[in-house]
Amino acid sequence: MASSISRNGGFCGALQRAPPPMPPGLARRLSSRECYGVGKVKVMLRVSDRAPDKDSPLDPEFMALDKKKRQVTLTDPRNVCPPPQAAQERGPMVAAPKMFAFDNLFTAEDKQSDVCASALSEVIPAVLEGSDGCLLAMGYPSTGQPHTVLGGDVATGAGAGAATGTGTGTGSVAACSLGAAPCAIAWLYKGIQERRQKSGARFSVRVSAVGVSATKPDALSTDLLISHAAESDDSPGIYLRDDFLGGPTELRAPTAERAALFLDSALAGRLKSSGSTSTPAGGGPAPLESALIFTLHVYQYSLSRKGGVAGGRSRLHIIDLGGCANRSGGLPLSGIGNILLAILSGQRHPPHKDHPLTPLLKDCLAPITCHVAIVAHVLHEQSYQDALSTIQIASRIHRLRRRKHRVPMPLAVGLAQGLSGGGGSSAGSGADPSSSEISADTVIYMGPNDDATDGEHPPVYLPSLSAGDNRAIMSKALKGSGLEKPPTQMKAGLSSPMMMKKAMAAAGEKVKKLPGNSPMGSLKRQAAAGACSSPLVPHEQQQQQQQIAHGSPIPIPRHMVSKGSNVPSPKGSPLRRAHAGAHPGAALEQLEAGMRKITEEQWIDGPRVSRAKVAEARHLMREVNHVKQCETWVDGPKSLSCRSLTAGNLPAAGAQTQGYGFMDSHKKTMIRQWVETQTSQVFQSPATVSASNSPTALHWKLSQLKQKSLDLPERPAFPPEQQSMDLPQQCFESQPLLGQDMSLPPDGDEDQDSGPSEVPPALPLFDDPLGSRDISHDSLHRMLSRHVSREQLHEADLVASRASSSHHQHQHHRPSSQRSIDCGLQVTEEEIARTMAREQEHSMHPLSALSHCDNLSFVSSFNMACESFSECGERARHQFDQLARLHEIFTSQLAMAEVTPSAALFRTDVSSVFSEPVFRFNVGQSSVCSEPAYRLTPSPPKQPSHSPSQGSLPSLNGIMEIAGMDDYALLRQPDGASDPSLPKSEKRFAPQHDDICELDEKAMAAAVGKRNSLEDAQHKLNEITNILPLAAQSRLPLLPLNTSSEAYDSGHDSNSTPRTSKHSGISRRAESGYHSVATVRDSDESSFASGMSKGQRHRITISGGGGGGCGAGGGGSATGNYQRHSHGVGGHKKHRHRHEGNGGGNKGLCNWLLTPFSCTYPETEGEISDF
């Protein structure tokens, strides 16, 4: 019934000229800054018209209002009896009047400002505090909803513009008749201005408006401010989406007048979407207005004290459902009520989800922090059924204040605010613990079917007030108090999953035995008895504490309750106990003792042990006979935990009732008999040290000595001079905690912290406790030195047992404990190269003794990354960078072998060079190991010669002797260490190495220039091979070498040397002709050639596994992926060696490289793979 002026707008001018004054209640709330955490629902009823004349008999009154009680009474007019009839004469089917109460009740006599102040008093402060707020007007069409939301003079039916005297149809609405929407705009901006002045926070307000058709449920929501989107500046959402949840247009509104202007524009767009812009002239019904959702988005932020930024967004929704609740295509009012009930109660899937109004309402009302004010509208003139349905829906929403929200609560302060809310609010007070949205697990309470609970949580029972002892602890039984929460000691005791399972299983078995008719009585009495009962036997007391902690109503068995006990029986009363009246102070003392018991830490299987005692016993626990001062028993006496259990400290028979854990007298007797039996067995054995050093035997004896100490109280004490000398050698090793010792059974199981050192014979005990002995620093030092010496002797014996018989002649030159010293920093590789060229008259190299060091137990720290890959060469490192000098020796020797074969060469090992194992390691650039270390190992099984050319290859010993490097073979150790006493030779190494990665044009000339010394080299080779035995020669692996007539193999011959990729693991030296067999390093430079000049170095071509080249002679086809071609000794002899290479056997090297750990019979061919 509002005027067309108020529906068309004009609120911008009204707020400019006469803004509505802020109500005093709202001003107080804004100044107090209350915390609005949890949202509330406030439901009000407004009767928009005046009551009809009571004298009219045709239209009897069915609605009675009581503003004082805020109550409305509805009476069915069909059941209204005439005045002459009495109430007792009504028929039995006549219904009684229905009464409904609300948070507030308004009639036509109430001012518009009072209605707006009551509706917005909690919504606006909540928005300024960061929560959402919503004002919703609901009812059937033409019941006064536009009047409440927008304003107007309903009584006169004339426009507010005429009342102001302006006479224009577009004049502003009078200030006294402004609705909730313009008042909310004015009061919100006024509150923002005050908040900005007080706190310094910054605010930004944006406006959006959405309309929903009342008669077209399939139509989409309409953005009513889309026409202003292009004109607005800095609009964050300028694109219109299909639905409201995607985001409507938000227009910036820096002032209240600007926001009111947007409200006027939204109202104009609402009328257009409804299909009519004016009231119909003919007396037909007015068109149904579409629903309006006008939203003020408040963005605020402020700087905190610590320099951070705090803020966020809150929204104020003003919703006018208009004519949506109609019976001509729209939702009925009952459907809207069901949607509101589902959203406000926290349901995820409200009904009528296909209607465009449903997602809009859910977006506005669903947040838990949203404060909702609902104004239901009825009229006296409407039918009884319509008024009843409207009031019933509003009453159902109003009763939701006693229901709890089913959505998680974001702020903890909101719960406190919700619990302390006033009586006028009707929202839930906290989060519902039964909601599945709070946690991932859904908890279903299967409790008793009684009136104490609504099925959502276990009942909270109060102790009986008739019991005198229970009155003092009644407050503790309230919800959230100490008795409802589990005690702290039960958290410590039941922290492990195994203990929780056992306790729950025991509780479940006892719950099954409960009678079904008394589910509450024993719980009440036991909750009272848990705090005031006397301490029981520890086993029974722990069971009782577990029952109380789990909340299971388990009665105490009668056989566990004595007459003198304070534990109440199921039929007993605290007032009937013997000690209740005789000793009034005894109950208090017992209560205090019980509370002390509760506060202390309780162990399930033994007494408590503090960390201080553990730290104190670390250096005294490992005595010779393993006697511990504070020995902890798994089931031992708690009262003797701080004393020694040796030498007559065992508890007497009368002290068993003092608390002996789970062990009764029978079990104690059995253990004592077992100790005696074990002690007698120990004494029958000789008292000498066992020759075996196995840990099992040692620890078994230690366990016997440990048990022997429990049954020898009559032994004499030791002389005092022996006390400080017999500390064990094990006391400086790591000790386990007492908790680990407690887990061991009292038999001879192994102790994990015992070392390999010897154990002295058993010593008698002395009566005085170990803590009284004086332990000086000298005695500790002597004990430590004895322990170290014993460990060294033990290690030396183990090393000596592993050494071979050929190395025993060097044992007398070394001390008893062998320690390796890394000398790689003192001896450079350049010095090693100079030493290689020294004179031959030196009979013994200073480092030759280091080649017989199989018993070195430590590896150099410079090559710790190089691990052993097989047993036969676990410390060997093959590196052919130092053998570059042998190139010309090989070429000359093989050239002479073609012309005048020597008998000495044929006396070498007949086994193929490819049957010898060659090892490959990844040696880094920082390694000092630049040459191989050859270990004298037994020769592998000899393989039959597969070609005549295999026997013509010289052995490595002969090659080394020819090159003058007989001492160099013994230079390097398996761990890469060198002798620091290596003398510096001034004689330079004449034939220098060449850079591996360069091409040297002078190699040919250097090779031809040195051909004149071949006869001398041949003579020396014959002498060495005659002197050395065949077995010694066969121990060193033979090297497959590529003998080429050229001094440099460029690798460009595609038939012999395939090119590798740029990123291949073989590296560039494989491409340039330098092929290391299986030990090529991934680095591009040699550590030996790093200090040499590039102009004087010569190349060498050594066939290997990395480069893809072929071996000499018979080694060509033995390499799996190699090309089956080889370079001959001369260019004219290439064809001659090619058929030898093809027929030279296919076994040995490649198969070993493929499987270096299990190559016993190298019969097959394999591929070479990079590590």
Curated annotation (Swiss-Prot):
- Which domain of life, per UniProt? Eukaryota
> Gene3D superfamilies of this UniProt entry?
Kinesin motor domain
Q: Where is the composition biased (Basic residues)?
A: 805-816, 1124-1139
Q: Name one GO biological process term.
A: microtubule-based movement
Region feature Disordered, mapped onto this chain: 1-24, 737-774, 798-820, 932-955, 1043-1099, 1124-1143
Similarity annotation: Belongs to the TRAFAC class myosin-kinesin ATPase superfamily. Kinesin family. KIF26 subfamily.
**Any GO molecular function:** microtubule binding
This one is known as Kinesin-like protein GA13060
- The UniProt regions of compositional bias labelled Polar residues, in chain numbering, are 1043-1059
Q: One Pfam family, please name it.
A: Kinesin
CC annotations in GO: cytoplasm; microtubule
The record, for InterPro entries, names: Kinesin-like_fam, Kinesin_motor_dom, Kinesin_motor_dom_sf, P-loop_NTPase
- The entry's keywords: ATP-binding, Cytoplasm, Cytoskeleton, Microtubule, Motor protein, Nucleotide-binding
Q: Where is the protein found, in the record's own terms?
A: Cytoplasm, Cytoskeleton
Give start and end of each Kinesin motor domain: 40-400
Q: Which residues form a coiled coil?
A: none
Traced from the root, the source organism's taxonomic lineage reads: Eukaryota, Metazoa, Ecdysozoa, Arthropoda, Hexapoda
